[in-house]
Curated annotation (Swiss-Prot):
One of its GO terms (cellular component) is cytoplasm. This is tRNA 5-methylaminomethyl-2-thiouridine biosynthesis bifunctional protein MnmC. The gene is mnmC. The keyword Glycoprotein does not apply. It catalyses: 5-aminomethyl-2-thiouridine(34) in tRNA + S-adenosyl-L-methionine = 5-methylaminomethyl-2-thiouridine(34) in tRNA + S-adenosyl-L-homocysteine + H(+). It comes from Saccharophagus degradans (strain 2-40 / ATCC 43961 / DSM 17024).
Length: 707
């Protein structure tokens, strides 16, 4: 399913070749072209893209649950985005805006700030953007949340054609093209407005090639509009052949003409869809073979965005799900069987925002990097690092030569493109300056990451007027009526809540519900030790992870851990596990040597719900027996083309299996989940979506003839 997908991704981005003129404007030496107009770039942006897409008149009609999606083919210095964001703020519509942009040669945050410095009216917006802007050396999708979730920016660093293909592949522009019969979730939302932008067609023809517009058409609908500054004949023909109807009008300033218009029909609309695969699928198949569609659902044309939701589970996964849904205008009932939030693995005093980082190129390492970057942005943008923890940095120690090579490569790659990189390689002799104590090896320091108190975070996430918390409420059964409403019931059939959708966030206990009983998860016991700080350890001002982990002391106590105990289920604190944690700390730093009386040492025991492939399980819940019957052909041959959508429970989702990385994984995974629920274009790559998908285990077991 995924090995061939790996070749679609580049290991690093292509740096922009640019110079700056006396006015501080960037100029591309590679394309011999300006990034924006040298006369009045902002006025041109408003004239071409904002006015010709009629944004100010369209936005007031949005409902509070609608998302308006803008897609741009060249981010450049971000001027178009800031102008759109400013107009959105001044219009103050009820819904949300999702701005998607592609950039093959991304500028770094310092270059973005310098380029935008010319417009003081954007100073506040530019500062927010640059504070959350991803490392320019990291390829792929990067999702940024602004204005408390009302504005979302998804950047794709890499070739626009590849990025557009990812969106098409993930969202089901496959078969039945003319009526969009397959999608992620119950209903698909497509692009509302296109900004076709980039260096001029004569100097950068790749961004204006016909397949760009054909891919754009596959993500468009009858109300989709477009605008572009150019009227070149090759662009006109490509736009028209892709199914867009164009108008030619006088351009801005000295530019003679420009194009704008609407989408009419897909060029394959009059062709048998089963014999006419889309551009993305033809390109994919040429490189990688068969593209499966088991992750897609048959679209429900009558589906409306959910107004109510049940979230089962009050740990990190449930709190994040409730928070994200509430921000989208959903009234959430959160059911927790315990008397308070965060009772399971989410109950530690301190937890690090941690994933295992590398540039090895495998799917998990790419997800880890994306999750780490998004989690840190999320906790900063919502101020959770201030209210529930501290972004004092995390040092990842090089515990082997192989790990040192990986971590050093990350630091060097980021240092080569960013003047103030998020990731910094620190030599062993310099670690004391970085974290406060000298460590046994060098490591990778993530300056904007840190630790959080999971209990406080769960309370902060669920502190929203649209979230109702019901404790001592054990949802043992789920039932759906003929109208699609979900009911959460106790063992004896007592109704706890009803809603349009349900999200299961109960870690391994999801196996106790009939709909998710087959999910492959196991519990791994972990014990954390609470250690009294001493003279040397009090110098620690950042978190350190290696053989174990430790965070700076709070109220004189360090939280350190954690043991991994397979096939054990005791909740009792054990002296041997305390000693295990203490020994690991001593191996990391002589300053982190502790000798407490083990018999009285305090700590915490929890159980991590892990999956066989280490990815969490996030997305719509498949109907197991129907899935196996529909895709039975995979038992004979994994590459069998079965152009059918998968069978899924309408309105039932799951978010479990985060293991020990809940703080790092849940923000991005939950954002992807909500995009699925609302049919929004995904903020993650197709590869990542398939690795998170709950049906992936059924697909794999069928191809291996295990079920």
């Amino acid at each position: 399913m995924t090995k061939k997908l790996e070749h679609e991704y580049i290991a690093h981005t292509e740096r922009p070749a640019l110079t700056w003129d006396e006015q501080g404007q960037p100029y591309s030496t590679e394309y011999d072209d300006v990034y924006y107009s040298t006369t009045d770039a902002l006025a041109e942006t408003r004239f071409v893209f904002l006015d010709k897409n009629n944004l100010a008149a369209r936005w007031p009609h949005l409902t509070h649950q609608q998302t308006f999606t803008v897609c741009e083919t060249g981010f450049g210095a971000g001027l178009n985005f800031l102008a759109t964001w400013q107009l959105w703020r001044s219009t103050r519509p009820s819904g949300r805006m999702h701005f998607i942009s592609f950039e093959k040669h991304p500028l770094n945050s310092a270059q973005i700030a310098k380029a935008l410095n010319r417009w003081p009216q954007f100073a506040a917006l530019s500062e927010q953007l640059c504070a959350l802007y991803p490392p320019s050396s990291a390829p792929g999708f990067h999702h940024i949340t602004l204005d408390e979730g009302q504005v979302q920016l998804t950047l794709y660093f890499g070739d626009a054609k590849t990025g557009l293909e990812q969106l098409v592949l993930a969202h089901g522009a496959i078969n039945k093209i003319e009526n969009r019969s397959s999608c992620i979730g119950d209903k698909q939302q497509l692009v509302d407005a296109w900004y076709f932008d980039g260096f001029t067609p004569a100097k950068n023809p790749s961004i204006w090639q016909p397949c760009i517009f054909t891919l754009a058409a596959e993500l468009s609908k009858s109300t989709t509009t477009f605008a572009t500054f150019t009227s070149a004949r090759s662009v006109r023909d490509a736009i028209e052949n892709a199914g867009f109807k164009w108008q030619k009008v006088p351009g801005f300033g000295l530019k003679r003409e420009m194009l704008f218009g609407t989408f009419e029909q897909h060029p394959f609309a009059q062709v048998d869809p089963n014999k006419a695969p889309t551009t993305a699928h033809r390109s994919y198949r040429k490189r990688n073979g068969v593209q499966h569609s088991w992750h897609l659902q048959t679209a429900n044309s009558e589906h409306q965005p959910p107004k109510t939701a049940i979230v089962i589970g009050g740990g990190l996964a449930g709190a994040h799900a409730a928070h994200a849904l509430a921000l989208r205008g959903v009234n959430v009932t959160l059911l927790e069987r315990a008397p308070n939030l965060a009772n399971g693995a989410s109950s530690n005093l301190q937890g690090l925002v941690y994933t295992r980082l590398s540039l090895s190129g495998n799917p998990l390492s790419r997800f880890n990097m994306a999750a780490q970057l998004y989690a840190d942005r999320f906790y900063h943008s919502h101020n959770f690092y201030t209210t529930c923890g501290e972004a004092s940095g995390v040092l990842h120690l090089a515990t082997s030569n192989a790990i040192e090579k990986q971590l050093r490569n990350i630091g060097e790659q980021h240092a080569s493109t960013d003047p103030n990189p998020i990731f910094n390689w620190v030599e062993q002799q310099d670690t004391e300056q970085a974290v406060g104590v000298s460590t046994s090896t060098g490591g990778l320091f993530i300056r904007n990451s840190g630790w959080l108190n999971p209990v406080q975070l769960c309370h902060a996430l669920t502190n929203h007027p649209r979230i109702t918390k019901l404790f001592n409420s054990d949802a043992a059964q789920l039932q759906q009526d003929a109208h699609g409403q979900w009911f959460a019931l106790t063992n004896d059939g007592h109704k706890l809540a009803s809603a349009d959708i349900t999200v299961i966030c109960t870690a391994r206990d999801a196996k106790h519900l009939a709909q998710t009983a087959y999910l492959p998860m196991r519990n791994i016991r972990g014990q954390v030790s609470h250690l009294s700080s001493h003279g040397l350890s009090q110098r620690l001002h950042a978190s350190v992870c290696g053989a174990g982990y430790i965070a700076p002391a709070q109220s004189g106590i360090h939280c350190a851990g954690a043991s991994f105990n397979l096939h054990e289920n005791t909740l009792d604190l054990r002296e041997e596990d305390h000693q295990f944690n203490i020994d690991n700390l001593a191996s990391m730093s002589k300053s982190l040597t502790f000798n407490p009386p083990l018999t009285t040492l305090d700590g915490k025991v929890g159980f991590r719900a892990t999956t066989p492939d280490y990815f969490p399980i996030v997305g719509p819940v498949p109907i197991r027996d129907e899935f196996c019957e529909r895709f039975a052909g995979y038992r004979k041959r994994a590459a069998t083309p079965i152009p059918q959508t998968g069978p899924y429970y309408r309105g039932l989702y799951v978010s479990v299996g985060y293991g020990s990385r809940g703080l790092a994984y849940t923000p991005l995974a939950t954002e992807s989940l909500c995009h699925s629920i609302f049919g929004e274009l995904q903020p993650i790559a197709t590869e990542t979506l398939l690795h998170l998908h709950p049906a992936r285990f059924l697909f794999r077991d069928l191809t291996r003839n295990r079920i």
